[in-house]
Swiss-Prot record:
Native organism: Escherichia coli O1:K1 / APEC
InterPro entries: YtcA (IPR031381)
Keyword set, alphabetical order: Cell membrane, Lipoprotein, Membrane, Palmitate, Signal, Transmembrane, Transmembrane helix
Protein name: Uncharacterized protein YtcA
Keyword Magnesium part of the UniProt annotation: no
Cell location: Cell membrane; Membrane
């Protein structure tokens, strides 16, 4: 058994540098988009796009006469889902 543990310890030493890299990976500048001379954060555009897409989804649901329970929770979840998908896709 000591050989297995020593091999694991050697592998840990080889990959120990990865842990600090992941810890500081979020320390970069926030993505800002210049619009007419002002810089707006990326999450702002994701929220606007998400709101528009949620309203389009709401319009489609209304036109198809689908009755939803817990409408507030559903639309809030759709808004969050769309915002995160935009963030994942574009940032």
């Amino acid at each position: 058994m000591p050989t297995v543990l020593s091999r694991m310890a050697m592998q840990l030493k080889k990959t120990a540098w990865i842990i600090p890299v992941f810890m500081v990976s979020g320390c970069s500048l926030s993505p800002a988009i210049p619009v007419i001379g002002a810089y707006y954060p990326g999450w702002f555009f994701c929220a606007i796009a998400s709101l528009i897409l949620t309203l389009i989804t709401r319009r489609i649901i209304q036109r198809t006469n689908i009755n939803l329970a817990f409408v507030g929770i559903i639309y809030t979840a759709l808004f969050a889902l769309y915002a995160m998908l935009f963030w994942l896709a574009f940032f």
